Amino acid sequence: RKPAAPARPVLVHGDYRTGNYLADESGVTAILDWEGAHLGDPVEDLGWVCVKSWRFGAVDKPAGGFGSRQELWTAYERAGGGRVDPARAHWWEVFGTVRWGVICHQQAWRHLSGSVRSMELASIGRRAVETEVDLLQLLKETA
């Protein structure tokens, strides 16, 4: 069930994941691709960065392949973001997984329909099945 609207909507990036960070030896220097920014739930970006597709093989580190969910939430809270409700964060991770699965199907269709012939789109499209498995695992955790 979708959580209630947040008491205080905040600026949400909308695509907060490792592919949209710039970093150097000092750490993250910029966050890119703000076209999906909107006012919303403070936990939405935290759920999106935990979608399994952004771990790039580091499945034991669900927070973008860098750490645990708890480490992410603790850092968020220490930075002034407020307390993270784990159930709310889980809902947004499930939502993000569904969202990514839909995007994978859309990218595959763009390639297969001939509207945009692209190996990149074809390879993203094949990830739809992985996302379906990820979703089943997340839903099992919820049950």
Where are these regions (language model features)?
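Conserved catalytic-loop position in the HRD/HxD motif
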Residues: 15, 33
